[in-house]
Amino acid sequence: GTALLSFSLSSFGANQLCNVVNGAVLIAQDPQNTKLGKVTNSYDSDSIFNQYGTYGSEYSSNSIWNEYSTFGSEYSQYSPFNAYSSQPPMLIKQGQIIGYLSANKRINNSVAPNLLKALCEDEL
């Protein structure tokens, strides 16, 4: 099975982190468990790194990069950019929660969205 991103994530090398999260699906912890895309290369239409796709565009309501959306606002409890949220999006791979996408440093097994983008966008 997939090991939990046993952290701190900072102990991982960038390569290791990107390998672990590659292919993970991002699921919100809202009542609908809204799909927020996949952690895959930017050519994948479902990728959070595809700026023209549903999940990578800063204009899409289901994109974490839309700062005015439920899932991108730093004030929304479901957003990975909310540094105080206890309900950030889950990273799910092979049917298991492997970690969380969150700017809240108190969340175990989490990586901040901007860090994930900086480390992995060009590696996947």
Outline where the language-model segments fall.
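Repetitive, compositionally biased segments used for assembly/scaffolding
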Residues: 14-124
